[in-house]
Amino acid sequence: GATGSTGDIGPTGATGSTGDIGPTGATGSTGGVLDFADFYALMPPDNAATVAAGGDVDFPRDGPFSGAGIARTGADTFNLSEIGSYQVLFQVSVTEAGQLVLTLNSGAGAVELAYTVVGRATGTSQIVGVALVQTSVINSILTVRNPASESTALTITPLAGGTESVSAHLVITRLR
């Protein structure tokens, strides 16, 4: 004879037991700092008496660093070997009012990064700057500069506040 009609769906069965735990997944990449370097100067004797308008500050000594990804190419020029985001901190003691700016050369000449200009109107304290810099090509060159638009040279202050040499620092950290 003919096949009969399909019957009603029955009730859901009881939940089964939990299966075995699967294998551990691969370890992910480490987060945080990818590379860092500290460059510094002692005054005296490491910098010229003045840094002319449009001139770069020297940081001729090497502090702690993590590898070759951030390296000097001269006393005042620093290679950022990877495309990425970098946190840049710098401090320099100067005698007069003035400004400093970061420059980045990505192959077409050094460009002053206007968003990194820092300065002070009076006094003889340090000029301190902090900025994030994004590179778009490998081997970009970074400097700390007395802006070309300034009318006066900056005097790097030796022995500020006492008898010991005063340090200036440039710390570069690659974040991604």
Briefly describe each language-model feature range.
Residues 11, 20-176:
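Extracellular jelly-roll beta-sandwich "head" domains, especially the C-terminal globular C1q domain
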Residues 1-11:
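Low-complexity/repetitive intrinsically disordered segments
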